[in-house]
Regions:
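N-terminal glycine-rich FAD/FM-binding segment characteristic of electron-transfer flavoproteins
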Residues: 1-290
Length: 290
């Protein structure tokens, strides 16, 4: 059966490069100051979506993300791997959202997209590690949900068969469509970008990224509509501004500290019995061991 699949994806700060400017004064992530990447577990989810597309002729895969205009980059990265379209939720009213406000915005967008069979995303994002957004989206849409998925084995007769991780092993479950699925980072890694698709979509942009008239390639967007990515505001998805962004986020970060572990002093030991015995005695005296 042909499936309409939406992949929930997030552009996240690269946590390997967190510096002193990582947070704003309001306690939110300063995304402009940090390198941005495609959330790793969302790539695992994208791979599952693309496999389903291959197994079910006529299926489509779309990338849904929320963020500033530069977040359109992860839609392009999805297109380079085989996705068909994408939607970027971008509006200052979306800014500063916690998981509750984020799931509300994504759910309203999914309603606007309409007739979705499978919503699939990573288990959690590396900038929050809450694993809340997927289940909250399912709850707001009133859909079945399967979390901690390793693989979507098949979709047949209106049901998805999914292998998921549980304590002490794995289980295989069957869920009626439509369904929301969250995927673990231990699932199959996402395929690499396809050179032909990179050439096809490298100039795909949302309207806020569009080059000014008269600049090179600006005429491409009339000639090739597929290069224009969908860009939606709060109003476009009929969202309630009181449930979006900071206004709709009951979670408040009171303070954040950057903790750096540093050794105050170091000692060089040899492999001699005397050095080893001396170190053990010192650790015992300092109550570090024993």
């Amino acid at each position: 059966m042909a499936l309409k699949i939406v992949v929930l994806a997030k552009q996240v700060p690269d946590t390997r490069n967190v510096g002193k400017d990582a947070m704003t004064a309001e306690g939110t992530v300063n995304r402009a100051a940090l390198p941005a990447i495609f959330n790793p577990e969302d790539l695992n989810a994208l791979e599952q979506a693309l496999r389903l597309k291959e197994q079910n002729p006529g299926s489509t895969v779309g990338i849904l993300t929320m963020g500033p205009p530069r977040a359109g980059e992860i839609i392009r990265q999805g297109l380079y791997r085989g996705a068909d379209t994408g939607w970027l939720l971008t509006d200052r009213l979306f800014a500063g959202a916690d998981t509750l406000a984020t799931s509300y915005a994504l759910a309203t967008a999914i309603k606007k997209i309409g007739d979705v069979d499978i919503v699939i995303g990573g288990r959690q994002a590396i900038d929050g590690d809450t694993a809340q957004v997927g289940p909250q989206v399912a709850q707001k849409l009133g859909l079945n949900q399967v979390t901690y998925a390793e693989e979507v084995l098949s979709v047949k007769d209106g049901k998805a068969v999914i292998k998921r991780v549980i304590d002490g092993g794995v289980e295989t479950v069957e869920a009626p469509l439509p369904v929301v699925i969250t995927v673990n980072g231990s699932a199959a890694p996402c395929r690499p970008q396809n050179a032909k698709l990179v050439m096809k979509y490298k100039r795909a942009t949302c309207p806020m990224e569009r080059p000014a008239e008269g600049t090179p390639y600006d005429n491409l967007y009339d000639e090739r509509p597929y290069l224009t990515l969908n860009q939606w505001s709060v109003a476009d998805v009929d969202g309630d501004v009181n449930q979006c962004g900071l206004a709709g986020s009951p979670t408040k970060v009171k303070a954040i500290k950057n903790i750096v572990f540093q050794a105050k002093e170091s000692k060089t030991l040899t492999a001699s019995d005397a050095d080893i015995e001396g170190m053990i005695k010192e650790l015992l005296d300092e109550k570090i061991i024993g």
